[in-house]
C-alpha cells in the first residue's frame, strides 16, 4: 500500500471524527502516504496532523462561492486540474468514510482511476433522515462507518479509539494570555447552533453561568454575530471570546478543562483535545448513539424533540460530576 485517498467534504465535526480512521490507517500501513480531499472549512481539522501527507481542496461545481476562484469557468478549470493532479498520484485505495452516501464525493470518486474504491451503498448506508434506516438498521457511531469499509483494520467498536487535532503552538500561547488564569477550571459554553432543535435558550446558559460562575471561569464561545449583548450578561461573571478562525477555535478550546455543547463540532473537538464533554442532544437514538464524544470522559443529556427541555440543574450536575476528574 503506497498511497491512500480519503474524501470527506461535509462538516467540521465529521472530519474530526475521521481522524481516528486516518490514524488507524497509518498504523496499519505506516509507509503509505495518506491524502485527504476536504473542503475549505473542514480541512482546518487536519492542520499539522502527522498522519496526513497532504490535504487537497475540493472544488464545487454548484456552490462555487466556496471555491478559491468562484467564477463558472474558473471552477470548471480548477476541478479539471484537481482531478488530473490526483490521478497522477496513482492511489491504491480510495475511501469515503461517511455513514450516509455523499453524492458529491461519490461522483468525484468515480472520476478517479483507483483500483480499490470503497464507500457505503444504498444497502449499507445509514441516513438518520430516513425513517426506515432508523427503524431497521443498526445504529453505531459515525466513526465506525469508515472502519466498516476497511475490515483489514479489525475495529468494530469505539472502545479503544480516540480523535486527533493539533492546535498551533503560537495560537495556544495567544489564548493562554487571553483567557483567565486564576487557578480555577475553565469551562467552555458553546451557545450557538444552526439547528433550531439543538439550541439551548440563552436564559438557560445564563442560569448555568449564575450557578457555576463563583467556582469556575466561564468562557462563552459563539458564532459571529451571536455574542450576547452586554445587557444580557448583567449579574453573571463570564468571558466572551471571538474565535474568528477554526485554528483559533481549536487553540482556544485547548485551554479549557470542560466543554458544554449541543450536538455539533465542539463535542468532537473537545474529545480530540482530550477534554471532558457535557453533550446536549435531542432524544433521538440515531443522534446520541452516532455522535457522542469518543475517547474521553463525557456525560450525554437528551430530552424531547428539542434540547430546550434539558434542565439547567441536570447540566450543572453533569458539569460537577466531570470536573473532579479533570481539576481538583
For the regions a language model picked out, list residue spans one by one.
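Catalytic machinery of carbohydrate-active enzymes
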Residues: 1-328
Amino acid at each position: 500500500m503506497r498511497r491512500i485517498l480519503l474524501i470527506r467534504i461535509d462538516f467540521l465535526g465529521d472530519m474530526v471524527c475521521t481522524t481516528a480512521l486516518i490514524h488507524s490507517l497509518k498504523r496499519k500501513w505506516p509507509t503509505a502516504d495518506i491524502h485527504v480531499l476536504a473542503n475549505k472549512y473542514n480541512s482546518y481539522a487536519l492542520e499539522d496532523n502527522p498522519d496526513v501527507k497532504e490535504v487537497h481542496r475540493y472544488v464545487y461545481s454548484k456552490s462555487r462561492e466556496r471555491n478559491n476562484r468562484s467564477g463558472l469557468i474558473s471552477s470548471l478549470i480548477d476541478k479539471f486540474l484537481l482531478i488530473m493532479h490526483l490521478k497522477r498520484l496513482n492511489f491504491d485505495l480510495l475511501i469515503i468514510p461517511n455513514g450516509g452516501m455523499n453524492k458529491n464525493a461519490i461522483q468525484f470518486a468515480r472520476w478517479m482511476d483507483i483500483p480499490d474504491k470503497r464507500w457505503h451503498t444504498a444497502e449499507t448506508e445509514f441516513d438518520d433522515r430516513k425513517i426506515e434506516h432508523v427503524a431497521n438498521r443498526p445504529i453505531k457511531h459515525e466513526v465506525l462507518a469508515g472502519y466498516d469499509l476497511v475490515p483489514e483494520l479489525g475495529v468494530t467498536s469505539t472502545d479503544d479509539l480516540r480523535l486527533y487535532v493539533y492546535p498551533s503552538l503560537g495560537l495556544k500561547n495567544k489564548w493562554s494570555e487571553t483567557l483567565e488564569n486564576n487557578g480555577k477550571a475553565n469551562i467552555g459554553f458553546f451557545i450557538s447552533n444552526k439547528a433550531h432543535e439543538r439550541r439551548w435558550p440563552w436564559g438557560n446558559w445564563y442560569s448555568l453561568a449564575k450557578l457555576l460562575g463563583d467556582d469556575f471561569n466561564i468562557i462563552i464561545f459563539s458564532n459571529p454575530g451571536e455574542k450576547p449583548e452586554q445587557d444580557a450578561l448583567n449579574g453573571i461573571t463570564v468571558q466572551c471570546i471571538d474565535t474568528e478562525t477554526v485554528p483559533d477555535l481549536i487553540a482556544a478550546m485547548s485551554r479549557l478543562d470542560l466543554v458544554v455543547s449541543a450536538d455539533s463540532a465542539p463535542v468532537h473537538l473537545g474529545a480530540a483535545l482530550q477534554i471532558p464533554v457535557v453533550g446536549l442532544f435531542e432524544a433521538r437514538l440515531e443522534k446520541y448513539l452516532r455522535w457522542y464524544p469518543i475517547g474521553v470522559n463525557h456525560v450525554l443529556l437528551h430530552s424531547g424533540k428539542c434540547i430546550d427541555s434539558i434542565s439547567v440543574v441536570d447540566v450543572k450536575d453533569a458539569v460537577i460530576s466531570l470536573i473532579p476528574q479533570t481539576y481538583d
